[in-house]
Amino acid sequence: MGGKQRDEDDEAYGKPVKYDPSFRGPIKNRSCTDVICCVLFLLFILGYIVVGIVAWLYGDPRQVLYPRNSTGAYCGMGENKDKPYLLYFNIFSCILSSNIISVAENGLQCPTPQVCVSSCPEDPWTVGKNEFSQTVGEVFYTKNRNFCLPGVPWNMTVITSLQQELCPSFLLPSAPALGRCFPWTNVTPPALPGITNDTTIQQGISGLIDSLNARDISVKIFEDFAQSWYWILVALGVALVLSLLFILLLRLVAGPLVLVLILGVLGVLAYGIYYCWEEYRVLRDKGASISQLGFTTNLSAYQSVQETWLAALIVLAVLEAILLLMLIFLRQRIRIAIALLKEASKAVGQMMSTMFYPLVTFVLLLICIAYWAMTALYLATSGQPQYVLWASNISSPGCEKVPINTSCNPTAHLVNSSCPGLMCVFQGYSSKGLIQRSVFNLQIYGVLGLFWTLNWVLALGQCVLAGAFASFYWAFHKPQDIPTFPLISAFIRTLRYHTGSLAFGALILTLVQIARVILEYIDHKLRGVQNPVARCIMCCFKCCLWCLEKFIKFLNRNAYIMIAIYGKNFCVSAKNAFMLLMRNIVRVVVLDKVTDLLLFFGKLLVVGGVGVLSFFFFSGRIPGLGKDFKSPHLNYYWLPIMTSILGAYVIASGFFSVFGMCVDTLFLCFLEDLERNNGSLDRPYYMSKSLLKILGKKNEAPPDNKKRKK
């Protein structure tokens, strides 16, 4: 009865793969797949390139990278090449009117003249009454105070220049931050109109001190990297060696290591059960019950009631029981999983070039991200600059008839205007053109292009690695039958025939990810809503989309393996992979969990080892090191430690992603091998002898005078 039921289940998920005498691993004679999707993808990329060209033609990222003076000219460029900093004549008017940081980021809307300077003022200075009658040249130019607006004549009196706001009336010790001169908080400002006390000024400047501190911190961080970059590279090299050794040694220690890890998980769960029981017993004796607490939104309060620890105890006990039952009844499948891990280690050892393919993926991902970032930046800064007339005090005599806020030419000479302080200032960028009106849509196009290209690059890496590892499994005589350049052959084959299939799978995943991003945006906007029903619905939607994304990633991964082997289109490959996995669902679950546990331990070993070594080295806690190996003196010794840990995690993830792809590929090949062959002379198994031994199978030995042909 059990065999009949199993046959019916197999029929529900398709028929087993039939024997094909012509099959010798990844098919070489194949044709292009999903051509329509390939054409759409190439057209989309062409449009993406056009968007980038348009953004480059119309965009001007200098407004983000460089500050502008009152006339809209860039500091540090062109005629102001030797004047990289921006000085505000009266920065307190900025502080009193708005947030200076937002003013600096959103344009020159600060109500005070601004001028490009070669260096920020270092000493405090205020115009004295006895200097009002002197000329600008005597007070400013000859005393190296080159802070007036361009074009102010030498013979103009100081009082006139101050009335027209052509020169500053005071200077404060300042330091550059964000390309602008900001004063320190401990300076004493002069008496200014509209400011009644120093507290207002101090409160305003305190908003700037974070930027200045950030500048100091950034300088120290740069110094630390300059001092420790060599040792960070050494730490990353150690991470690379550890990752490689861990994978290569799995063929020797996979079995004992998996057993130790499983026993370790059992031990952790057992300790958790013991701890929960002790907490439950103490609270039970105290009589602390949830009925006394009632309902509360303070989750930490539930730690003080016995029901919480009882529920945790039950959950951990159930998990412990499930794991024990799996260890008892699924030990055969665990042995198969261990054997596949050993086989994957051998495959990686035979094709060491696969371990460095993540570098190719990383470079391609970096190109995609950099292209999107530059395109988005240029699009955001597209538009023609707009200039308007502006005066600090429009009620001054002579300003009544001046058309304030009307368009003007910044090159016009306004010094002799009857309105004091009248200037043609930069207002912003025009949004009237076709490109400017379409910026939002083009940005959406760019985001879609970012997700699609990133997913396509990841799909390319998975399919290429699958093709290389499949050629290893289906080589009957190893290593003689393995192709000479399996990775390069798989790369060329994938690009030539299956660009469309990869684009199809990447597009499906992209649409789900875009939906998740939109949902996260809606959730962020509705975060203030207190309706519990709405929050619950939103949480359910987010959970469903997260599960859908995980499932599609899993399905795509196995579909790419089938594409690499058989050269079918995406839908057929996804269907065949899904049916094959469902016919062996228990083996799939066991292998997946064993592999996840092993790779998690591997990452923990590599990252933890590099982290511990980095900590003891950079903190100077390793005695006896020679002069050449002495740790550098750092401002923040944790900075290279965290950098080393992050780099080690990235390296370990790259290496173990290759190993994980190898395991998945060999597993699908193993399942097909079981269905396709029977061990006879005509249909021998391709799996290793250890797998044959675990399964209780063997290949029929050929006669002495014959050699098996494959």
Curated annotation (Swiss-Prot):
Family: Belongs to the CTL (choline transporter-like) family.
Disease note: An interstitial deletion causing the fusion of exon 10 of CTL4 with the 3'-UTR of NEU has been detected in two patients affected by sialidosis. Deafness, autosomal dominant, 72: A form of non-syndromic sensorineural hearing loss. Sensorineural deafness results from damage to the neural receptors of the inner ear, the nerve pathways to the brain, or the area of the brain that receives sound information. DFNA72 primarily affects the middle frequencies. It gradually progresses to whole-frequency hearing loss.
Transmembrane stretches, start-end: 35-55, 230-250, 253-273, 310-330, 359-379, 456-476, 502-522, 561-581, 598-618, 639-659
UniProt name for this protein: Choline transporter-like protein 4
Disulphide bond pairs: none
Record InterPro entries: Choline_transptr-like
Gene Ontology molecular function: antiporter activity; choline transmembrane transporter activity; thiamine pyrophosphate transmembrane transporter activity
Topology versus the membrane: Multi-pass membrane protein
Record field: catalytic activity: choline(out) + n H(+)(in) = choline(in) + n H(+)(out); thiamine diphosphate(out) = thiamine diphosphate(in)
The record's account of how the chain is modified after translation: N-glycosylated; N-glycosylation of Asn-69, Asn-155 and Asn-393 is required for a proper thiamine pyrophosphate uptake.
